[in-house]
Protein backbone atom coordinates (compact mmCIF):
# COMPACT_ATOMS: atom_id res chain seq x y z
CA UNK A 1 0.00 0.00 0.00
CA UNK A 2 1.47 3.34 -1.03
CA UNK A 3 1.39 6.45 1.12
CA UNK A 4 -0.96 9.31 0.29
CA UNK A 5 1.21 12.42 0.38
CA UNK A 6 0.48 16.16 0.38
CA UNK A 7 3.15 18.86 0.38
CA UNK A 8 2.16 22.27 1.72
CA UNK A 9 4.83 24.45 0.15
CA UNK A 10 6.26 27.84 1.15
CA UNK A 11 3.89 28.64 4.03
CA UNK A 12 4.41 30.85 7.05
CA UNK A 13 4.23 28.15 9.73
CA UNK A 14 3.05 29.26 13.18
CA UNK A 15 3.24 26.66 15.95
CA UNK A 16 1.24 27.54 19.10
CA UNK A 17 3.70 25.61 21.27
CA UNK A 18 6.33 28.37 21.04
CA UNK A 19 4.89 30.89 18.53
CA UNK A 20 8.02 30.81 16.42
CA UNK A 21 7.33 31.77 12.82
CA UNK A 22 9.02 29.64 10.16
CA UNK A 23 8.84 30.10 6.41
CA UNK A 24 8.92 26.59 5.06
CA UNK A 25 7.05 23.53 3.90
CA UNK A 26 5.26 20.61 5.51
CA UNK A 27 4.81 17.07 4.23
CA UNK A 28 1.77 14.98 5.09
CA UNK A 29 1.90 11.20 4.76
CA UNK A 30 -1.49 9.56 5.11
CA UNK A 31 -3.00 11.03 8.30
CA UNK A 32 0.14 12.47 9.92
CA UNK A 33 2.70 15.24 9.67
CA UNK A 34 5.81 13.51 8.29
CA UNK A 35 8.32 16.34 7.77
CA UNK A 36 8.73 20.08 8.32
CA UNK A 37 11.53 21.96 6.57
CA UNK A 38 12.68 24.40 3.93
CA UNK A 39 13.83 21.91 1.27
CA UNK A 40 11.42 18.95 1.11
CA UNK A 41 11.65 16.77 -2.00
CA UNK A 42 8.41 17.07 -3.96
CA UNK A 43 9.24 14.69 -6.81
CA UNK A 44 7.13 11.79 -5.50
CA UNK A 45 4.41 13.78 -3.77
CA UNK A 46 0.80 13.12 -4.79
CA UNK A 47 -0.33 16.72 -4.36
CA UNK A 48 1.40 20.06 -3.85
CA UNK A 49 -0.42 23.02 -2.27
CA UNK A 50 1.19 26.39 -3.00
CA UNK A 51 0.96 28.22 0.32
CA UNK A 52 2.77 31.46 -0.53
CA UNK A 53 1.07 34.32 1.28
CA UNK A 54 -0.69 31.91 3.61
CA UNK A 55 -0.31 31.10 7.31
CA UNK A 56 -0.20 27.42 8.27
CA UNK A 57 -1.82 26.67 11.63
CA UNK A 58 -3.13 23.62 13.46
CA UNK A 59 -6.86 23.22 12.90
CA UNK A 60 -8.97 24.96 15.52
CA UNK A 61 -10.54 23.02 18.40
CA UNK A 62 -14.08 23.96 19.47
CA UNK A 63 -14.42 22.51 22.98
CA UNK A 64 -18.16 23.06 23.46
CA UNK A 65 -20.98 23.23 20.96
CA UNK A 66 -24.32 21.69 20.00
CA UNK A 67 -23.95 21.15 16.27
CA UNK A 68 -27.52 20.09 15.50
CA UNK A 69 -28.78 23.31 17.12
CA UNK A 70 -27.43 25.16 14.09
CA UNK A 71 -31.00 24.66 12.84
CA UNK A 72 -32.17 26.99 15.63
CA UNK A 73 -29.95 29.90 14.58
CA UNK A 74 -31.84 33.16 15.21
CA UNK A 75 -34.88 31.35 16.58
CA UNK A 76 -35.06 32.95 20.05
CA UNK A 77 -32.80 35.97 20.27
CA UNK A 78 -32.58 38.69 22.93
CA UNK A 79 -33.74 36.45 25.80
CA UNK A 80 -32.29 35.30 29.11
CA UNK A 81 -30.98 31.73 29.33
CA UNK A 82 -33.96 30.68 31.46
CA UNK A 83 -36.54 32.03 29.00
CA UNK A 84 -34.48 30.98 25.99
CA UNK A 85 -34.38 27.36 27.21
CA UNK A 86 -37.74 26.87 28.92
CA UNK A 87 -40.00 28.88 26.63
CA UNK A 88 -38.34 28.38 23.25
CA UNK A 89 -35.58 25.79 22.84
CA UNK A 90 -36.93 22.90 24.92
CA UNK A 91 -40.42 23.07 23.32
CA UNK A 92 -38.79 23.05 19.88
CA UNK A 93 -36.50 20.16 20.86
CA UNK A 94 -39.56 18.09 21.79
CA UNK A 95 -40.22 17.75 18.04
CA UNK A 96 -36.67 16.88 17.00
CA UNK A 97 -36.04 13.66 15.09
CA UNK A 98 -32.86 11.85 14.19
CA UNK A 99 -33.12 13.20 10.63
CA UNK A 100 -33.41 16.80 11.82
CA UNK A 101 -30.36 16.37 14.07
CA UNK A 102 -28.42 14.82 11.20
CA UNK A 103 -29.27 17.73 8.88
CA UNK A 104 -28.40 20.27 11.59
CA UNK A 105 -25.08 18.53 12.21
CA UNK A 106 -24.21 18.59 8.51
CA UNK A 107 -25.05 22.30 8.37
CA UNK A 108 -22.85 22.92 11.40
CA UNK A 109 -20.04 20.83 9.92
CA UNK A 110 -20.00 23.04 6.84
CA UNK A 111 -19.61 26.13 9.00
CA UNK A 112 -16.86 24.52 11.10
CA UNK A 113 -14.84 23.42 8.09
CA UNK A 114 -15.23 26.76 6.30
CA UNK A 115 -13.98 28.66 9.36
CA UNK A 116 -11.05 26.36 10.12
CA UNK A 117 -12.30 24.14 12.93
CA UNK A 118 -11.17 20.54 12.55
CA UNK A 119 -12.22 19.20 15.97
CA UNK A 120 -15.34 19.89 18.02
CA UNK A 121 -16.86 18.62 21.26
CA UNK A 122 -20.63 18.19 21.23
CA UNK A 123 -23.35 17.30 23.70
CA UNK A 124 -26.87 16.76 22.41
CA UNK A 125 -29.44 14.17 21.31
CA UNK A 126 -29.53 11.61 18.46
CA UNK A 127 -25.77 11.57 18.66
CA UNK A 128 -25.39 8.51 16.44
CA UNK A 129 -26.75 10.68 13.65
CA UNK A 130 -24.30 13.43 14.55
CA UNK A 131 -21.58 10.78 14.33
CA UNK A 132 -22.82 9.92 10.85
CA UNK A 133 -22.45 13.58 9.85
CA UNK A 134 -18.94 13.63 11.32
CA UNK A 135 -17.97 10.55 9.34
CA UNK A 136 -19.29 12.00 6.08
CA UNK A 137 -17.80 15.47 6.55
CA UNK A 138 -14.31 14.27 7.53
CA UNK A 139 -13.91 16.32 10.71
CA UNK A 140 -12.89 15.10 14.19
CA UNK A 141 -15.27 15.04 17.15
CA UNK A 142 -15.76 14.27 20.82
CA UNK A 143 -19.42 13.36 21.24
CA UNK A 144 -21.58 12.90 24.32
CA UNK A 145 -25.26 12.31 24.87
CA UNK A 146 -26.90 15.08 26.94
CA UNK A 147 -28.15 13.25 30.03
CA UNK A 148 -31.06 14.79 31.96
CA UNK A 149 -33.11 12.99 34.63
CA UNK A 150 -34.48 15.64 37.03
CA UNK A 151 -34.38 13.00 39.78
CA UNK A 152 -36.52 10.45 37.90
CA UNK A 153 -35.05 6.94 38.41
CA UNK A 154 -36.56 5.52 35.21
CA UNK A 155 -35.29 8.48 33.20
CA UNK A 156 -31.84 8.12 34.76
CA UNK A 157 -31.57 4.50 33.65
CA UNK A 158 -32.65 5.47 30.13
CA UNK A 159 -30.07 8.27 29.90
CA UNK A 160 -27.26 6.00 31.08
CA UNK A 161 -28.21 3.34 28.53
CA UNK A 162 -28.25 5.95 25.75
CA UNK A 163 -24.75 7.23 26.51
CA UNK A 164 -23.33 3.71 26.94
CA UNK A 165 -24.87 2.70 23.61
CA UNK A 166 -23.31 5.77 21.98
CA UNK A 167 -19.92 4.85 23.42
CA UNK A 168 -20.11 1.22 22.33
CA UNK A 169 -21.27 2.06 18.80
CA UNK A 170 -19.36 5.25 17.99
CA UNK A 171 -16.17 5.48 20.07
CA UNK A 172 -13.33 5.02 17.57
CA UNK A 173 -15.68 5.38 14.59
CA UNK A 174 -14.73 7.29 11.41
CA UNK A 175 -11.18 5.89 11.28
CA UNK A 176 -10.68 6.87 14.92
CA UNK A 177 -11.79 10.49 14.47
CA UNK A 178 -14.68 10.10 16.91
CA UNK A 179 -14.23 9.86 20.67
CA UNK A 180 -17.18 9.50 23.06
CA UNK A 181 -17.52 11.15 26.49
CA UNK A 182 -20.33 10.91 29.04
CA UNK A 183 -22.52 14.04 29.05
CA UNK A 184 -24.58 14.85 32.15
CA UNK A 185 -26.20 18.13 31.13
CA UNK A 186 -25.60 20.07 34.35
CA UNK A 187 -25.77 19.82 38.15
CA UNK A 188 -29.30 21.27 38.07
CA UNK A 189 -30.74 18.85 35.48
CA UNK A 190 -28.82 15.71 36.54
CA UNK A 191 -29.51 14.16 39.94
CA UNK A 192 -26.81 13.26 42.45
CA UNK A 193 -27.36 9.58 41.59
CA UNK A 194 -26.86 10.26 37.88
CA UNK A 195 -23.74 12.33 38.50
CA UNK A 196 -22.26 9.60 40.71
CA UNK A 197 -23.12 6.95 38.10
CA UNK A 198 -21.44 9.03 35.40
CA UNK A 199 -18.30 9.39 37.52
CA UNK A 200 -18.14 5.60 37.87
CA UNK A 201 -18.85 5.03 34.17
CA UNK A 202 -16.14 7.46 33.04
CA UNK A 203 -13.63 5.55 35.16
CA UNK A 204 -14.92 2.19 33.91
CA UNK A 205 -14.82 3.18 30.22
CA UNK A 206 -11.64 5.26 30.59
CA UNK A 207 -13.18 8.29 28.96
CA UNK A 208 -14.12 11.88 29.77
CA UNK A 209 -17.10 13.83 31.05
CA UNK A 210 -18.65 16.89 29.39
CA UNK A 211 -20.95 19.06 31.56
CA UNK A 212 -22.34 22.62 31.81
CA UNK A 213 -21.42 24.27 35.14
CA UNK A 214 -22.01 27.72 36.66
CA UNK A 215 -23.35 29.37 33.52
CA UNK A 216 -25.66 31.88 35.23
CA UNK A 217 -26.08 33.61 38.57
CA UNK A 218 -29.48 31.91 38.92
CA UNK A 219 -27.72 28.54 38.81
CA UNK A 220 -25.51 29.63 41.71
CA UNK A 221 -28.46 30.83 43.77
CA UNK A 222 -30.43 27.65 43.10
CA UNK A 223 -27.44 25.49 44.06
CA UNK A 224 -26.96 27.38 47.31
CA UNK A 225 -30.64 26.92 48.11
CA UNK A 226 -30.67 23.20 47.22
CA UNK A 227 -27.29 22.12 48.62
CA UNK A 228 -25.94 25.06 50.62
CA UNK A 229 -22.99 24.80 48.22
CA UNK A 230 -22.00 26.51 44.97
CA UNK A 231 -22.01 24.21 41.88
CA UNK A 232 -18.30 23.30 41.85
CA UNK A 233 -18.35 22.89 45.64
CA UNK A 234 -21.30 20.52 45.29
CA UNK A 235 -19.64 18.51 42.50
CA UNK A 236 -16.45 18.30 44.56
CA UNK A 237 -18.40 17.11 47.62
CA UNK A 238 -19.79 14.10 45.74
CA UNK A 239 -16.43 13.13 44.20
CA UNK A 240 -17.47 14.00 40.65
CA UNK A 241 -14.55 16.19 39.58
CA UNK A 242 -11.27 15.09 38.02
CA UNK A 243 -8.82 15.78 35.17
CA UNK A 244 -11.20 14.09 32.72
CA UNK A 245 -14.02 16.59 33.36
CA UNK A 246 -14.68 19.36 30.81
CA UNK A 247 -16.79 22.09 32.43
CA UNK A 248 -18.44 24.37 29.89
CA UNK A 249 -19.04 28.04 30.76
CA UNK A 250 -17.80 28.27 34.38
CA UNK A 251 -18.78 31.93 34.53
CA UNK A 252 -19.71 32.54 38.16
CA UNK A 253 -16.75 31.24 40.17
CA UNK A 254 -15.69 32.00 43.73
CA UNK A 255 -12.04 31.96 44.80
CA UNK A 256 -12.73 28.66 46.55
CA UNK A 257 -14.18 27.16 43.36
CA UNK A 258 -11.11 28.22 41.38
CA UNK A 259 -9.01 26.36 43.96
CA UNK A 260 -11.30 23.32 43.61
CA UNK A 261 -10.96 23.42 39.80
CA UNK A 262 -7.18 23.68 40.08
CA UNK A 263 -6.87 20.91 42.69
CA UNK A 264 -8.94 18.51 40.58
CA UNK A 265 -7.29 19.58 37.30
CA UNK A 266 -10.71 20.20 35.76
CA UNK A 267 -10.64 21.52 32.19
CA UNK A 268 -12.66 24.63 31.28
CA UNK A 269 -14.44 25.50 28.02
CA UNK A 270 -14.94 29.27 27.71
CA UNK A 271 -17.90 30.41 25.57
CA UNK A 272 -17.76 34.23 25.58
CA UNK A 273 -20.16 35.08 22.74
CA UNK A 274 -22.95 32.89 24.11
CA UNK A 275 -22.35 34.16 27.65
CA UNK A 276 -22.56 37.75 26.39
CA UNK A 277 -25.61 37.20 24.17
CA UNK A 278 -27.60 35.51 26.95
CA UNK A 279 -26.27 38.07 29.46
CA UNK A 280 -24.95 35.22 31.59
CA UNK A 281 -21.82 37.04 32.72
CA UNK A 282 -18.06 37.21 32.14
CA UNK A 283 -15.95 34.19 33.07
CA UNK A 284 -12.72 34.95 35.01
CA UNK A 285 -10.52 33.49 32.29
CA UNK A 286 -7.37 35.45 33.10
CA UNK A 287 -7.59 34.28 36.73
CA UNK A 288 -7.97 30.68 35.58
CA UNK A 289 -4.96 30.89 33.26
CA UNK A 290 -2.89 32.61 35.97
CA UNK A 291 -3.73 29.63 38.21
CA UNK A 292 -2.42 27.21 35.53
CA UNK A 293 -5.90 25.89 34.80
CA UNK A 294 -6.34 24.57 31.26
CA UNK A 295 -8.87 26.67 29.33
CA UNK A 296 -10.13 26.01 25.81
CA UNK A 297 -12.62 27.92 23.69
CA UNK A 298 -16.14 26.97 22.60
CA UNK A 299 -18.85 28.62 20.55
CA UNK A 300 -21.80 26.93 22.26
CA UNK A 301 -24.58 26.30 19.75
CA UNK A 302 -25.32 28.61 16.83
CA UNK A 303 -28.71 29.11 18.49
CA UNK A 304 -27.07 31.23 21.20
CA UNK A 305 -24.03 32.69 19.44
CA UNK A 306 -25.16 32.86 16.48
CA UNK A 307 -22.24 31.41 14.50
CA UNK A 308 -19.46 28.83 14.85
CA UNK A 309 -16.53 31.04 13.78
CA UNK A 310 -13.78 30.23 16.28
CA UNK A 311 -11.55 33.14 15.22
CA UNK A 312 -14.37 35.52 16.14
CA UNK A 313 -14.78 33.65 19.44
CA UNK A 314 -11.08 33.97 20.25
CA UNK A 315 -11.05 37.69 19.48
CA UNK A 316 -14.13 38.19 21.66
CA UNK A 317 -12.52 36.23 24.50
CA UNK A 318 -9.42 38.40 24.39
CA UNK A 319 -11.25 41.74 24.15
CA UNK A 320 -13.71 40.77 26.87
CA UNK A 321 -10.96 40.05 29.39
CA UNK A 322 -9.19 43.31 28.51
CA UNK A 323 -12.23 45.51 29.04
CA UNK A 324 -13.46 43.60 32.09
CA UNK A 325 -10.09 43.91 33.84
CA UNK A 326 -9.26 47.31 32.32
CA UNK A 327 -5.96 45.75 31.30
CA UNK A 328 -4.87 45.76 27.63
CA UNK A 329 -2.35 43.00 28.39
CA UNK A 330 -5.02 40.55 29.58
CA UNK A 331 -5.47 37.41 27.45
CA UNK A 332 -2.89 38.21 24.78
CA UNK A 333 -3.18 37.09 21.18
CA UNK A 334 -0.72 34.26 21.87
CA UNK A 335 -2.78 33.06 24.83
CA UNK A 336 -5.98 33.29 22.80
CA UNK A 337 -4.53 31.38 19.85
CA UNK A 338 -3.27 28.67 22.20
CA UNK A 339 -6.80 28.38 23.65
CA UNK A 340 -8.10 27.67 20.16
CA UNK A 341 -5.47 25.04 19.35
CA UNK A 342 -3.15 23.22 21.78
CA UNK A 343 -5.07 24.15 24.95
CA UNK A 344 -8.30 23.08 23.30
CA UNK A 345 -6.70 19.77 22.42
CA UNK A 346 -5.58 19.38 26.04
CA UNK A 347 -9.10 20.12 27.28
CA UNK A 348 -10.33 17.12 25.26
CA UNK A 349 -7.40 14.86 26.15
CA UNK A 350 -6.11 14.97 22.55
CA UNK A 351 -2.93 17.02 23.02
CA UNK A 352 -0.72 14.08 22.01
CA UNK A 353 -2.53 13.85 18.65
CA UNK A 354 -3.57 17.35 17.60
CA UNK A 355 -3.32 21.04 18.48
CA UNK A 356 0.23 21.83 17.36
CA UNK A 357 2.46 21.43 14.31
CA UNK A 358 4.86 18.59 15.11
CA UNK A 359 6.17 15.60 13.19
CA UNK A 360 4.15 12.53 14.14
CA UNK A 361 1.00 14.41 15.06
CA UNK A 362 -2.23 14.13 13.10
CA UNK A 363 -2.39 16.29 9.99
CA UNK A 364 -5.19 18.55 11.20
CA UNK A 365 -4.15 21.81 9.55
CA UNK A 366 -5.53 25.02 8.07
CA UNK A 367 -4.23 27.72 5.76
CA UNK A 368 -5.22 31.35 6.34
CA UNK A 369 -4.96 33.59 3.27
CA UNK A 370 -3.33 36.91 4.16
CA UNK A 371 -4.05 38.43 0.74
CA UNK A 372 -7.30 39.98 1.92
CA UNK A 373 -8.09 43.60 2.78
CA UNK A 374 -8.63 42.85 6.47
CA UNK A 375 -5.20 41.17 6.73
CA UNK A 376 -3.11 43.87 5.01
CA UNK A 377 -0.65 45.19 6.04
CA UNK A 378 0.64 42.41 8.28
CA UNK A 379 2.98 44.57 10.34
CA UNK A 380 1.97 43.04 13.66
CA UNK A 381 2.94 39.63 15.02
CA UNK A 382 1.21 36.83 13.13
CA UNK A 383 -0.85 35.75 16.14
CA UNK A 384 -2.07 39.35 16.55
CA UNK A 385 -3.06 39.54 12.89
CA UNK A 386 -5.05 36.32 13.24
CA UNK A 387 -6.80 37.12 16.52
CA UNK A 388 -7.51 40.84 15.99
CA UNK A 389 -7.88 41.10 12.20
CA UNK A 390 -8.90 37.76 10.69
CA UNK A 391 -12.19 35.92 10.56
CA UNK A 392 -13.35 32.52 9.38
CA UNK A 393 -13.70 33.71 5.79
CA UNK A 394 -9.91 34.11 5.63
CA UNK A 395 -9.50 30.33 5.98
CA UNK A 396 -8.56 29.07 2.54
CA UNK A 397 -7.83 25.38 3.14
CA UNK A 398 -8.89 22.90 5.84
CA UNK A 399 -7.26 19.49 6.29
CA UNK A 400 -8.26 16.88 8.86
CA UNK A 401 -6.63 13.49 9.38
CA UNK A 402 -4.55 14.13 6.28
CA UNK A 403 -7.59 14.63 4.03
CA UNK A 404 -8.45 17.91 2.33
CA UNK A 405 -11.95 18.98 3.41
CA UNK A 406 -11.78 22.42 1.80
CA UNK A 407 -9.38 23.94 -0.73
CA UNK A 408 -9.60 27.46 -2.17
CA UNK A 409 -12.82 27.85 -0.10
CA UNK A 410 -14.45 24.91 -1.93
CA UNK A 411 -15.68 21.96 0.14
CA UNK A 412 -14.65 18.50 -1.02
CA UNK A 413 -16.80 16.23 1.16
CA UNK A 414 -20.21 17.90 1.47
CA UNK A 415 -22.79 19.32 -0.95
CA UNK A 416 -23.38 22.80 0.47
CA UNK A 417 -26.44 23.78 -1.55
CA UNK A 418 -28.26 20.51 -0.94
CA UNK A 419 -27.65 20.75 2.81
CA UNK A 420 -28.80 24.39 2.90
CA UNK A 421 -32.00 23.37 1.12
CA UNK A 422 -32.68 20.55 3.58
CA UNK A 423 -31.91 22.76 6.59
CA UNK A 424 -34.36 25.46 5.49
CA UNK A 425 -37.06 22.83 5.00
CA UNK A 426 -36.32 21.21 8.37
CA UNK A 427 -36.68 24.38 10.45
CA UNK A 428 -39.95 25.31 8.74
CA UNK A 429 -41.31 21.85 9.57
CA UNK A 430 -40.12 22.18 13.18
CA UNK A 431 -41.74 25.59 13.55
CA UNK A 432 -45.02 24.23 12.22
CA UNK A 433 -44.90 21.20 14.53
CA UNK A 434 -44.21 23.42 17.55
CA UNK A 435 -47.25 25.68 17.08
Curated annotation (Swiss-Prot):
Enzyme Commission number(s) of this protein: 3.5.4.41, 3.5.4.31, 3.5.4.4, 3.5.4.28
Which Gene3D superfamilies does the UniProt entry name for this protein?
Metal-dependent hydrolases (3.20.20.140), Urease, subunit C, domain 1 (2.30.40.10)
UniProt GO MF annotations: 5'-deoxyadenosine deaminase activity; 5'-methylthioadenosine deaminase activity; adenosine deaminase activity; metal ion binding; S-adenosylhomocysteine deaminase activity
Q: Which reaction does it catalyse?
A: 5'-deoxyadenosine + H2O + H(+) = 5'-deoxyinosine + NH4(+); S-adenosyl-L-homocysteine + H2O + H(+) = S-inosyl-L-homocysteine + NH4(+); S-methyl-5'-thioadenosine + H2O + H(+) = S-methyl-5'-thioinosine + NH4(+); adenosine + H2O + H(+) = inosine + NH4(+)
Query: Which Pfam family is one of those matched by this entry?
Result: Amidohydro_1
Spell out the family assignment given in the record's similarity comment: Belongs to the metallo-dependent hydrolases superfamily. MTA/SAH deaminase family.
What is noted besides the main data?
SAH is a product of SAM methyltransferases and is known to be a feedback inhibitor of these enzymes. As a result of this inhibition, organisms have evolved efficient enzymes to metabolize SAH via different pathways. The pathway found in methanogens differs from the canonical pathway, it uses the deamination of S-adenosyl-L-homocysteine to form S-inosyl-L-homocysteine for the regeneration of SAM from S-adenosyl-L-homocysteine. 5'-deoxyadenosine is a radical SAM enzyme reaction product which strongly inhibits radical SAM enzymes.
Please report the name of this protein according to its UniProt entry.
Answer: 5'-deoxyadenosine deaminase
- Source organism: Methanobrevibacter smithii (strain ATCC 35061 / DSM 861 / OCM 144 / PS)
Amino acid sequence: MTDNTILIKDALILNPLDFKEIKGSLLIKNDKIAEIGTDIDESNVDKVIDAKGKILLPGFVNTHTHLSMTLFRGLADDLSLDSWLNDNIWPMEANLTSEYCYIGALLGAIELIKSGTTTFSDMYFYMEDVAKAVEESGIRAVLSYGMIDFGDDEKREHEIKENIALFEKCNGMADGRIKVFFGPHSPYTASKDLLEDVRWLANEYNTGIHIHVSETQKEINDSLEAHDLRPFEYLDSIGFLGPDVVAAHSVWLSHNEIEIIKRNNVKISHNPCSNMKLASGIAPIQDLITNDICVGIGTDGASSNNNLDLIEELRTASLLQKVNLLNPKALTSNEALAMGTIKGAEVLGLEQEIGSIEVGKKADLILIDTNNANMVPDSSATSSNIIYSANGYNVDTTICDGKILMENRKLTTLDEEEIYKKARKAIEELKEASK
